[in-house]
Amino acid sequence: MTDYAKNIQAFYERDDYKALAGQPGATAVEASFKDLTYVPRKTKPLPGMMVGTMLQEFALQPAQPTALYLHIPFCNLRCSYCSFYRNPFEAEQVEEYVQALLAELDFLQQQGVFAKQRPEAVFFGGGTPSVLNPAQISALLNKIHSVAKLADDCEVTFESSIYDLSADKLDACIAGGVNRFSFGVQAFDTHLRRSLGRLNTKEEVTAKLEEVAAKGVKVIIDLIYGLNGQTQAMLLDDIRTALACGVSGMDLYKLQIMHKSPLGQAIAKGNIKYEYNDKMLAEMFVAADALLAEQGAKALSCCHWAMREDERSGYNTLVKSGANIITCGAACGGHMGMYNYMKTMDRSDYVKKATSGQYAVMGMGKHNENYLLLEKLSGQCDSGRFDFALLKQYSDADWESLFKPLLEQWELLDLLYAVDGKYYFTAKGKYYYRQMDRVLLTAAECALYGKPGLMEQAGQKMMGIMKNMK
């Protein structure tokens, strides 16, 4: 039997524990965390050729929470902060890719992937799915309905830019069962939008949001804070503008400066000076969180708010809770049962394999028996609330007691507070939730497996070259 309490002491005895757990910042709104890259332990890497085993085992599994993701890796425009831009829009290449998606959906059905699973969410992401024409949209939606029996209340989300979603595309989406549209607005201010590479004016954006909302479907938008030239007042005005447009939900993300993005490269070369520090960003987020609460929005996670009772952010919730994520397309990863996988990054390679009856996986891993426990723990952190009693079905450990030193420190830092054995994040805690999540998962794995050996530490370092987001 695992001695969790003994094992976790190795984490609390780390020389850098105090820095990892968080210390008071220079002001009340700040906290200081040492950077910690988290890489899951005990995941067994497997070659992509094992994909057949994964599909066979998954086809035999009983019904479980499941989502379906379709990746559309094309964009008409490139945003200045984006490092994921891969394929500019070319009609012939898009059609070729759509045919590959249709073939892949047929293949998954033939393999029995949908035999026992009823997807609770379908998500068209990208890239920009709205580059598809109406016929392509209809073909994909019809194919999904023909190969899979969706849950009765399945959430079907279609990501779109304001620029691309014409009336005929909107109608094709709704006719095919799309009931939720997600727009990467990022900012309403016209000048600020132009600096990001966005063409539409504030007036055009609000008109499109109102047009889609009038169809009776859910409208979700993303906003970014921390953009050069953006003030706190502008961010709060953006939130009020969104609410006036009748949006159903809203995501609020801190700008991530990616090294390979045009913005990241300009900052690295000294051509642009980034204006914000942690104090300013935290103040913006706390003010936004307060306004959303004042307006009656319900926080479903640390970065997503619902304005309608029926908005549940189903796909993201499934992703954060260890559900099966079946993916179609190139350059996307998912989970099936005890396996995770990554699809080929090369679009041409994907098209060739998908149209010849192959599931184009480039690499895989097999989870250990604690995978769901850790996913549920991370999902609770993402939601901004801990209820450790819910973890008992995955582990016999007393996680509240094991995490007590961390929880007490986070209460002192005003990151969370306890009510009847449950813990709720403050606005400050929501701002720092990513750092808290990495610390908590590292501590949990120490409790489960003990202190990592030198070889394991070296492997984690190699796998964690990419810096985690803050």
Regions found by a protein language model. Give the residues of each.
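Short beta-strand motif preference
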Residues: 68-70, 183, 425
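Charged, E/D/K/R/S-rich low-complexity terminal regions of large eukaryotic assembly subunits
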Residues: 1, 330-470
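C-terminal scaffold of the Radical SAM
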Residues: 60, 89-111, 118-397
